[in-house]
Regions:
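Acidic catalytic/metal-coordinating carboxylates
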Residues: 35-38, 61-67
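Receiver (REC) domain active-site loop signature in two-component systems and cognate sites
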Residues: 57
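Hydrophobic/aromatic residues positioned on beta-strands within the core alpha/beta folds
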Residues: 81-84
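C-terminal output helix
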Residues: 105-118
Length: 120
């Protein structure tokens, strides 16, 4: 069985590395992006099952990247989990996201949220 692909879009290397390690340990295949531009490119090319999207990133922030995902017919159904230290950032655009996680987030909550949005 092929592992479920999770795209992690996070500009801080250490945070991205920790999430990747946690998710790989839980049996997920992790695709990494350091900004919204890379996240869109990876989503188009690799079609992840779910995206964990930081809201504050260089080049293209997570909110803009998620709006772009929702505008593309082949990508709009991919669940997106917003991750931010400032949840008020997504309050006006909550409908774009399948879940919102406050940073920092425990590994258990991250995995549980991914499983919830995937219907597991």
């Amino acid at each position: 069985m092929t592992p479920t692909k999770v795209l992690v879009a996070e500009d801080y290397d250490d945070a991205r590395d920790v999430m990747a390690l946690v998710l790989q340990s839980a049996g997920f295949q992790v695709i990494e992006a350091k900004d919204g531009v890379e996240a869109l490119e990876a989503a188009r090319a690799l079609k992840p099952a779910v995206i964990v999207m930081d809201m504050f990133m260089p080049n293209m922030d997570g909110l803009t990247a998620t709006r772009a995902l929702r505008d593309e017919p082949s990508l709009r159904r991919i669940p997106v989990i917003a991750q931010t230290a400032q949840p008020s950032v997504v309050s006006g655009a909550r409908e774009l996201f399948d879940a919102v996680l406050a940073k920092p987030c425990s590994p258990d909550i991250l995995i549980r949220t991914i499983c919830d949005v995937l219907g597991r």
